[in-house]
Amino acid sequence: MNAARAALREALRTSDRSILTFGTAWVYERNGAVVANCHRCPAAEFRRRRLSVGEIADAVSTLLEGPLAGKGVLLTVSPVRHLGDGLAGNAASKATLRVAIEELLARHPRQTEYFPAFEILTDDLRDYRFYADDLVHPARQAIDYIWEQFAGSVLTDEARRLLPEVEAVVAAAHRPRDPRSAAHRTFCLRQLERIAALPQIDFQSEAAYFRRCIEINS
C-alpha cells in the first residue's frame, strides 16, 4: 500500500496530464470519516451514504488546486455498473457524479475536460451485446470502440501513429514464463532497441524492467 502511494505521488509530480475516473458516489463512513469498508469489519460499524454534488466538487477542487495544480485533467465517469447499489442506487450515483463533473468543468474551465465514456456505452452503443456476460462490465468490442473514440479525440496524428509501437513495448513489460532463458534475454535486448528508437516517449520504467531481466540472464 505504501509503495503504491509513493508511486502515485511520483507519477503526479512528474506528469503534466492526468485522468480522473469517477466510479461511484456511495461511500462508507466511520466516526465521521470516509473509509474503505474492506477490512472484514461488521457492516453495522459503518454508515453508508451517497456524497452530494457539492462534496464531490469541493474534494476534487482541492486536488486540482493542490497536487494537480497546473496540470491538465481529463474527467470521466466509469460505465461499469455498481449493481450492489441496486439499479436505482447506481443510476442516482452516476447522475450525481456526472453533475459534479459539470460543476468542476465550470469551476476549472482551463484545467479540466470531459470524455464521455459513460455516455458512449449507455447512449451511443446502448445494447446488451456490448456488455460482458455479467451485464456489468463492457465487452471487449465496447472497450475497443471507446478506446478508438478516446484516441481520436485526445491524441495528435503523431501520437496515433506511434501508438502501436508504444502499446507493443508496454505490453511486453510483463512477467515472462521463463525470465532466465536466453530467448527472453534476446527479447529484452530487442525491446531496449525499440525503446531507443522512440526517445520522445517516457519508457523509464519499461527500460528498467528489461535491463533487470538482462542482468538476471547475465
Features from the language model and the residues they span:
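Well-ordered, non-membrane alpha-helical segments in soluble/globular domains
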Residues: R50-L64, A91-A100
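Conserved catalytic region of serine esterases and O-acyltransferases that act on ester linkages
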Residues: D133-D134, Q149-S218
